[in-house]
Amino acid sequence: MMKKISKVVLAVGGTGGHIIPALAARETFIKEKVEVLLLGKGLTRFLEGEPDVLYYDIPSGSPFSLRPNQMFSGARQLYQGYTAALRMIKSFAPDVAVGFGSYHSLPAILASIRKRIPLFLHEQNVVPGKVNKLFSHFAKGVGMSFSAAGEHFRCRAEEVFLPIREPSEQIVFPEASPVICVVGGSQGAKILNDCVPKALAYVREKHANLYVHHIVGPKGDLEGVSRVYQDAGIQHKVTFFEKNILGVLQASDLVIGRAGATILNELLWVQVPAILIPYPGAHGHQEANAKFFTQTLGGGTMILQKHLTEESLRKQVLLALDPATSENRRKAMLDAQKNKSFKSLYQFICESL
């Protein structure tokens, strides 16, 4: 018999790769009549237009820096966040806490352990980050976006399903074919903004009705990217951010982007093939994600950033747009999606208590 919970703390912060899954998990808990408190840092821009979210921004710092001044500064901020989280958790009295990775989740995770609140984790990537790997030793269980991450945990670990952001409207491009979406993650990716438009200018020579929806990120050169497409005669829309990302993905024939776990889950959901250029930092997490997506699942191809050129990308785009190649990749993704778990994080937690 599953135990029920009535209150949960979600420890989260950092980039969209951690925050978006946490917000998706929040929706799952809310549907089960569970009261949710978000503790972390950096969520404000993701919560615009969401007045009913219970969220407190608390200090956080990384204890992993090798530079003494940064290490001490990070430790001080971490302690400040920890004491703030202790107060919040004491007042809120949750049944469980769930950490979503990144050092921004540390204050609430540590406070939960101190208060003897049962701890669970959610791992978005194929290879876990430092925080989740370390604190899995204190956790009752880990819910994973991809089952391949399970080999890194000794505690109970299962693949769980998080709801995908529903499209706010269906998007159709009746006069365009093919449609390519370019997305560099929540932070954008300068190298993609520089290289991809120039490569696609050559692709248009074989695909005259090409349409590109390019998301440059918050610091991207919107005008510069638009100018390249305009000069090449490519139909396009360039934006800093896209709230209706699933609607755009559903309307696309191909996606070019980074290999964050969130976008890969969305691609699997809509079965759209991709060319992935994984971010070379973050301890190789995105490269592992990209290998899993392209080699194990068969959903596309990977180009390492050090090998990315206009010519290498042009060749891969033309290959990906070949009807037979595209159909094979879509079929592989459909098969992979059929095999994914539909157990919710809420259900996994209740079963594990």
From Swiss-Prot:
InterPro entries in the cross-refs: GlcNAc_MurG (IPR006009), Glyco_trans_28_C (IPR007235), GlycoTrans_28_N (IPR004276)
Membrane-related topology note: Peripheral membrane protein
GO biological process terms, semicolon-separated: carbohydrate metabolic process; cell division; cell wall organization; lipid glycosylation; peptidoglycan biosynthetic process; regulation of cell shape
Keyword entries, A-Z: Cell cycle, Cell division, Cell inner membrane, Cell membrane, Cell shape, Cell wall biogenesis/degradation, Glycosyltransferase, Membrane, Peptidoglycan synthesis, Transferase
Cellular location(s): Cell inner membrane
HAMAP family to which the protein is assigned, alphabetical: MurG
Species name: Chlamydia muridarum (strain MoPn / Nigg)
Pathway per the UniProt entry: Cell wall biogenesis; peptidoglycan biosynthesis
Keyword hit for DNA-binding: no
Catalysed reaction, written as an equation: di-trans,octa-cis-undecaprenyl diphospho-N-acetyl-alpha-D-muramoyl-L-alanyl-D-glutamyl-meso-2,6-diaminopimeloyl-D-alanyl-D-alanine + UDP-N-acetyl-alpha-D-glucosamine = di-trans,octa-cis-undecaprenyl diphospho-[N-acetyl-alpha-D-glucosaminyl-(1->4)]-N-acetyl-alpha-D-muramoyl-L-alanyl-D-glutamyl-meso-2,6-diaminopimeloyl-D-alanyl-D-alanine + UDP + H(+)
Record protein name field: UDP-N-acetylglucosamine--N-acetylmuramyl-(pentapeptide) pyrophosphoryl-undecaprenol N-acetylglucosamine transferase
Gene Ontology cellular component list: plasma membrane
Family to which this protein belongs: Belongs to the glycosyltransferase 28 family. MurG subfamily.
Secretion signal span: none
Superkingdom classification of source: Bacteria
Documented EC number(s): 2.4.1.227
Cysteines paired by S-S bonds: none
GO MF terms held by the record: UDP-N-acetyl-D-glucosamine:N-acetylmuramoyl-L-alanyl-D-glutamyl-meso-2,6-diaminopimelyl-D-alanyl-D-alanine-diphosphoundecaprenol 4-beta-N-acetylglucosaminlytransferase activity; undecaprenyldiphospho-muramoylpentapeptide beta-N-acetylglucosaminyltransferase activity
Function: Cell wall formation. Catalyzes the transfer of a GlcNAc subunit on undecaprenyl-pyrophosphoryl-MurNAc-pentapeptide (lipid intermediate I) to form undecaprenyl-pyrophosphoryl-MurNAc-(pentapeptide)GlcNAc (lipid intermediate II).
